[in-house]
Amino acid sequence: MHNKIAKRKPAAKGSTVRPMKEQRAKDHSFAPIDMMGAKKTGLRTQFAALCYRLRKGKPEILLITSRRTQRWIIPKGWPQDGMRPAQSAAIEALEEAGVEGKLHDFSIGIYSYTKNHVSGRALPCVGIVYPLKVKKIHDRYREVSQRKRKWFSLAQAAHKVSEPELAHIIRNFEPNKIQNA
């Protein structure tokens, strides 16, 4: 397979095509991650847990802050040897958010983002999201002093995260459709 990049034709006079940044801000369109100059192994995969609970019949999503930038995110991490992807996501939920629960072993979506590595390199990543119904919340856990955690409604959580694809996954999350799965 060849790495050919399609060149965008200029917009026709009077068209409504807007630059991606402006369009994304208005309608949360999905923009591809920047793979310019990436090598065969350039795209990294992380496994993420969408931690949820039901309060008065309505779903709430647990978000945590990132360690360096304090952005609202969901727990996620690198694949772990000998574990299924969903198990890796559950381990991250425990370490980063201090929660355990009923793990669903199927993905509910994939989102893209750029991870700013400690080396200063920007790593293009995809996060594969697994739902986890929270049953137990720990007061003490590995990263308690490094992160904040907070419950949000679906709409609030979708608004708080900065990745448009993740916001879409959260906004459209329907836990009642996975209860018996």
Model-predicted regions and their roles:
Residues 2-56:
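Acidic, metal-coordinating catalytic segment for phosphate/diphosphate chemistry
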Residues 4, 70-71, 136-181:
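Nudix hydrolase/Nudix homology domain
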Residues 54-60, 118-122:
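Short, solvent-exposed loop/turn segments that connect beta-strands within catalytic domains
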Residues 57-100:
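Conserved Nudix-box catalytic region and its N-terminal flanking loop in Nudix hydrolases
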Residues 99-110:
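A short coil-to-beta-strand element that immediately follows conserved catalytic motifs
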Residues 110-139, 150:
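Active-site-adjacent beta-strand/loop module that shapes the phosphate/pyrophosphate-binding cleft
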